[in-house]
């Protein structure tokens, strides 16, 4: 029974055809959200740090936290929601936890996340001697 549900969810994800970049907790992302104001429809950018990811197939979601006017604001996004226009990873964060809820109590410099450095491929040494 569970396999049938899992298969249906995978088919639905494939049908949606959304390209979601790989991101992890600690990454700074910009989420483009479709907002309807009266008759106008526009895309609103929401930039912040991913503090949690919930992997549940079609019901997957993630929480983005940002500081707006000195106040912490968190927003939960459904990963496969039609309201999400785009997800762009701005910066990779180097963290050792999967849930960064401790950032809620932090402010200022202690709430910063170290940037993950990309490992470079080792240089090839030519043995021309």
UniProtKB/Swiss-Prot annotation:
Disulfide bonds: none annotated. The keyword Ribonucleoprotein applies. SUPFAM superfamilies: Translation proteins SH3-like domain. PROSITE patterns: RIBOSOMAL_L19 (PS01015). One of its GO terms (molecular function) is structural constituent of ribosome. One of its GO terms (cellular component) is cytosolic large ribosomal subunit. One of its GO terms (biological process) is translation. It holds the Pfam family Ribosomal_L19. Keywords: Ribonucleoprotein, Ribosomal protein. InterPro entries: Ribosomal_bL19, Ribosomal_bL19_CS, Ribosomal_bL19_sf, Translation_prot_SH3-like_sf. This protein is located at the 30S-50S ribosomal subunit interface and may play a role in the structure and function of the aminoacyl-tRNA binding site. Belongs to the bacterial ribosomal protein bL19 family. This is Large ribosomal subunit protein bL19. It comes from Methylobacillus flagellatus (strain ATCC 51484 / DSM 6875 / VKM B-1610 / KT). The lineage of its organism: Bacteria, Pseudomonadati, Pseudomonadota, Betaproteobacteria, Nitrosomonadales.
